[in-house]
C-alpha cells in the first residue's frame, strides 16, 4: 500500500508540473512572437565526433543497474523516469561532479552542466563582464556581436544582471557557457526550465533549439523536451535503463 501511495503521489506531482508548463504555453500563444534569435555560426559543431563514453556505469544514488553510453555529435537524449530514479545524478556523474559507484566515464570533448542555479544569473556583474570572464582571450567586439545575435543590445549587456528581465538573464547565462573557452560540444540540462517566467522559458527554448551541439536533458516539461527534438529517449526505473525512440 505504501508503495502504491508513493507512486500515486509522484504521478500527481508530475501532472501538476505539466499543468503549470501547459499554462505557460497557453500564455505564449496570446502574446507576440519574440524576434528571431541566432547563435554564432559553428558553436557546438566543431571537434570530436565521439563526445562521451560510459562503460558499466553504476550511479551512487537511484538506479543501480549498469549503463552503457556512447554519445556522438548531434545526439539529443531525453532522460525520463520517476523522481529519485537517478536522472539528475546521472548528469552530475557524466559532468564529473559526482563519483560513480562503479564503472567509468570518458569525456572526449568539453561539456557543460546547465541547471536552474546557473541560469539564475544575478548580482552586479553585467552580461558582457560574465561572458568575458568565461572567454578572456576573445575580442570584445566579437563578443558584442555574438550577444547582439541573441537579442541583447549594447545597453543591456552593460547593465547589472539584477536590472534585467528573466529572459535576458537566461540569454546571458547561456552565452557565458556556449561562448566560453573551451566551448562545450555537449550540454547536460537538469530541469533548466524550472522557476523561469514565460519570457525566460521562451528564450531558453529558442536558444537550445538553435544550438547544434549534443544534448542530454532532464525535464518534467514534456513540451520543452519535445521542442528540443530528442533523437533518443533513455527511460530509467528501479529495474534498469531502457532505450526508446520517442517520448
What do these predicted ranges mean?
Residues 1-61, 72:
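Coupling and communication elements adjacent to P-loop NTPase active sites across diverse families
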Residues 46-247:
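ABC ATP-binding cassette signature C-motif
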